[in-house]
């Protein structure tokens, strides 16, 4: 569900970095948690009510760790600017030295592939257009719904 995805994204530094590390403190401070954006709220077009949310993950080439705070500040700022210019709702972003996660509300007519590629291209500007990310990325939709495919007490539903 949305709450689980957003919590996971916001907690990347806690999940991946040692508790007493300076890197954990840095990446925790860099995380984006935007309380003004609520991806559980329906958005509207002229003909429909919708929830179109994406969880996107970009991994650095060969998981190369980037620890320069200025680069990560640039990435965070570019994510914010890109989401504003695309009229996307950036609710969370979590960073660790070798990858980043973020959650967005998008328009239902947009392709998740096109959205991911557009952010990958925007973020390349922070790295002087160097190809710093793996040539693929993870993208998934999420929302408030739960199809009940996995019941918490009984596990996966039987296949019939």
Where are these regions (language model features)?
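Charge-rich, low-complexity N-terminal segments
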Residues: 1-160
């Amino acid at each position: 569900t949305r709450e689980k995805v957003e919590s996971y994204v916001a907690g990347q530094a806690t999940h991946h970095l040692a508790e007493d590390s300076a890197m954990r403190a840095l990446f925790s401070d860099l995380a984006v948690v935007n309380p003004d954006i609520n991806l559980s709220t329906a958005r509207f077009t002229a003909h429909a009510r919708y929830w179109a949310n994406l969880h996107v993950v970009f991994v650095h080439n060969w998981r190369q760790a980037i620890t320069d705070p200025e680069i990560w500040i640039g990435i965070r700022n570019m994510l914010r600017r890109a989401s504003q210019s695309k009229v996307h709702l950036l609710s969370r972003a979590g960073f660790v030295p070798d990858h980043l996660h973020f959650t967005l509300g998008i328009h239902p007519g947009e392709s998740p592939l096109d959205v991911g590629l557009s952010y990958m291209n925007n973020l390349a500007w922070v790295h002087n257009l160097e190809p710093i990310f793996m040539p693929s990325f993870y993208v998934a939709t999420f929302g408030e719904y739960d199809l009940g495919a996995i019941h918490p007490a009984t596990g996966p539903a039987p296949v019939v």
